[in-house]
Amino acid sequence: MEGFSLRINQFLAHYTKHSRREAEKLVLEGRVKINHEHAKLASVVKENDRVFLDKRLIKPLKNKKFSVLVYHKPKGELVSKADPLKRRVIYESLEKKYAHFAPVGRLDFASEGVLLLSDSKAVVSALMHADLEKEYLIKIQGFVTREMENAMQEGLKLENATKGAHQKTPIKSMEFAPFIGYEIIKNHAKYSKLRVIINEGKNRELRRFFAFFNAGVLDLRRVRYGFVNLNALPVGKMRFLNRQEYNELHAFMANAANVKGD
């Protein structure tokens, strides 16, 4: 990351297992130094600075030529650069210095949760086209029926999958693969809650799936994308991948390159 500068809490969250809040606590406890001087909460780490945690040098990941952001997209934001209908887009919430970051897939306007963005086209493409698991918390109208469960277990093919889709969608039919997993958290006549895991990301796939059973989706939140969890990231906030997530991403990219080369 040539010419980079990061607040000390961002740097620690970026290159260690600690969250920003944990990083701030480490700074306040006097356990962090920049170039052998105690860091302050307002300290900024610049290129070639040496950062120490408990007297151990933090080594930025080798050959990391890209960055990945985790954004907790709120409802009412479009994953787009601009919108002709003047709806709010995600880039109005992100800092301007991230305007060149591209999103990994989409989350529709009415949905919230994990959205990954990167300054590397290769990373975006690899993550988008991989069959990584996506985990969602969903609230639907009415009961979870036996028919729904059968379809989640066995898959579903619809010639007319327009219910739950946008009115002007060009995608009319859709085939739904069996879900990787699901858990019924609450099953009630008024509304039900589920946790579902899929490894596809088709246009409004889950909304179309449940709409077929006349169960409108009331809430949809993506809580995990592959090896990246939403955890306690507040709505409308962003963070960098932490060290463990970057390690997993590097391993994923190396494997993707090997598969491509076969």
From Swiss-Prot:
Family annotation (CDD domains): S4
InterPro entries recorded: PsdUridine_s_RsuA/RluB/E/F_cat, PsdUridine_synth_cat_dom_sf, PsdUridine_synth_RsuA/RluA, PsdUridine_synth_RsuA/RluB/E/F, PsdUridine_synth_RsuA/RluB_CS, RsuA_PseudoU_synthase, S4_RNA-bd, S4_RNA-bd_sf
What is its EC class?
isomerase
Q: Where is the active site?
A: 108
One GO BP annotation of this record: enzyme-directed rRNA pseudouridine synthesis
EC number(s) for this protein? 5.4.99.-
> Which part of the chain is the S4 RNA-binding domain?
6-70
Mind listing the GO molecular function terms for this protein? RNA binding; rRNA pseudouridine synthase activity
**Which domain of life, per UniProt?**
Bacteria
Q: Which Pfam families match?
A: PseudoU_synth_2, S4
Which reaction(s) does its UniProt entry say it catalyses?
A: a uridine in RNA = a pseudouridine in RNA
Q: Which family does it belong to?
A: Belongs to the pseudouridine synthase RsuA family.
- Record protein name field: Uncharacterized RNA pseudouridine synthase HP_1459
Organism this protein belongs to: Helicobacter pylori (strain ATCC 700392 / 26695) (Campylobacter pylori)
